[in-house]
Regions:
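N-terminal Sec-pathway targeting helices
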Residues: 1-15
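Bacterial Sec-dependent signal peptides at the C-terminal "C-region" and cleavage site
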Residues: 19-33
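Functionally critical loop-and-helix segments that line ligand-binding/catalytic clefts
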Residues: 29-53, 173-223
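Hydrophobic anchor at the start of a short beta-strand
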Residues: 88, 155-157, 179
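Structural recognition of alpha->loop->beta junctions
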Residues: 108-128, 170-191
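Aromatic-lined carbohydrate-recognition surfaces of secreted/lumenal glycan-active proteins
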Residues: 153-167
Length: 223
């Protein structure tokens, strides 16, 4: 009887372990170290000297920051990249100093006229100084933006931030959004679609640039 009881306990532990792994599989996994697809993210801080030398498979361009700022290089970079067959996506640098609705409207206006190839990205690395909100309020604001993206683009946006910031604020709340890990030169524990692997020199672009490795199939980040 004792042996049988131990056997059942062992089986229960095994089943629980499998269930736990399955439950968290959507957010915890190993990095795909064999990926050879890379992309860059650019803004007005970057200078592209020769687009013909840029061999990236995809590029994410800063479109807006907050509710008022629009990046002056967005449309020019987008046209030049797409002309050379590079897939283009846009990202918003989200702030906590204005509403999600206002920020989405700004993003939507800034990207008008550009047929984006990739799912939009919310870049939310920190809260705006002087406008800090609770974790719950932050999640509500991000969810509003997610819903607006889904309504207008047909897909939920990708969330970009560091692992500590994601774990503290979003883990378990945004499993319906893909994650872009912003931890440079660091191991990745969370499941991610994209990893900002390092900052390095890329042919055709002046100075160093964010170098991002794809950790999924390219079609998974396409619109």
């Amino acid at each position: 009887m004792k042996k049988l009881k131990m056997k059942y306990m062992a089986m229960a532990v095994m089943v629980l372990g499998i269930a736990t792994v399955s439950f968290f599989a959507c957010r915890f996994t190993k990095e795909n170290k064999d990926s050879n697809i890379y992309g860059v993210d650019l803004s007005h801080h970057n200078c592209v000297e020769d687009w013909d030398q840029v061999t990236a498979s995809f590029v994410y361009l800063k479109a807006t920051e907050g509710a008022t700022h629009q990046d002056e290089t967005f449309k020019r970079f987008a046209h030049n990249a797409q002309k050379r067959g590079i897939l283009v996506g846009a990202y918003l640098f989200m702030t906590t100093s204005s509403s999600s609705e206002e920020q989405f409207q700004n993003f939507h206006q800034a990207t008008a006229g550009i047929k984006m190839d990739l799912i939009p990205v919310i870049d939310i690395e920190r809260q705006t100084k002087g406008y800090k909100v609770s974790g719950n309020e932050l999640r509500k604001r991000v969810r509003v933006f997610v819903n607006l993206c889904k309504k207008h683009y047909g897909k939920n946006p990708i969330i970009y931030c560091s692992q500590p910031f994601y774990t503290k604020n979003f883990l378990g709340h945004f499993n319906d959004c893909q994650y872009w890990c912003g931890d440079v030169n660091a191991p990745v524990v969370l499941y991610h679609a994209i990893h900002q692997k390092t900052i390095k020199k890329v042919a055709g672009i002046k100075g160093n640039v964010d170098y991002n490795i794809l950790n999924c199939k390219l079609k998974e980040i396409q619109l």
